[in-house]
UniProtKB/Swiss-Prot annotation:
Keywords: DNA-binding, Metal-binding, Nickel, Transcription, Transcription regulation. It comes from Campylobacter hominis (strain ATCC BAA-381 / DSM 21671 / CCUG 45161 / LMG 19568 / NCTC 13146 / CH001A). Belongs to the transcriptional regulatory CopG/NikR family. Its cofactor is Ni(2+). Binds 1 nickel ion per subunit. This is Putative nickel-responsive regulator. SUPFAM superfamilies: ACT-like, Ribbon-helix-helix. One of its GO terms (molecular function) is nickel cation binding. The keyword Magnesium does not apply. GO terms for biological process: response to nickel cation.
Length: 138
């Protein structure tokens, strides 16, 4: 088992109550595990702000109209000339008008962000969300 460090944190009562409520309403076994996950999320978010990060991973989810002229060809053009590695993409037909595409990306955080913005700004893209993924050592 990994060594653990114990420390004390002082919180306003309202924040402490909110944490307890969230732990109780989720599957977290303890406040400690909940807090560990919050710290990991913050570390990952801060790593994404570091332009030198070269090993970033993300999933870009987009909803778009497949009836939009040239949209699919524009997306493919951007994907083939991207400065990021596209590990895979999954395409789902939502209805007669809309498609959902999920694109797994690897590369520098800066290049992933740039690629996401290019795709999200295309005419016909109705929704774009970049899920930034990171792995911490603990």
């Amino acid at each position: 088992m990994k060594e653990l460090a114990r420390f004390s944190v002082t919180l306003p009562n309202e924040l402490f109550d909110e944490i307890n409520k969230r732990v109780k309403n989720t599957e977290y076994p303890s406040r400690s595990e909940f807090i560990r996950d919050l710290v990991r999320e913050k570390i990952i978010a801060d790593k994404w702000k570091d332009d030198s990060q070269s090993d970033a991973i993300a999933v870009l989810s987009i909803v778009y109209s497949h009836h939009q002229n040239n949209l699919v060809s524009q997306m493919l053009e951007l994907e083939h000339h991207a400065d990021v590695k596209i590990a895979c993409s999954t395409h789902i037909h939502i209805d007669k008008e809309n498609c959902l595409e999920m694109i797994s990306l690897q590369g520098s955080g800066k290049n992933i962000e740039k690629f996401s913005q290019k795709i999200g700004s295309l005419k016909g893209v109705k929704f774009s969300n970049l899920a930034r993924i990171g792995i911490t050592k603990a």
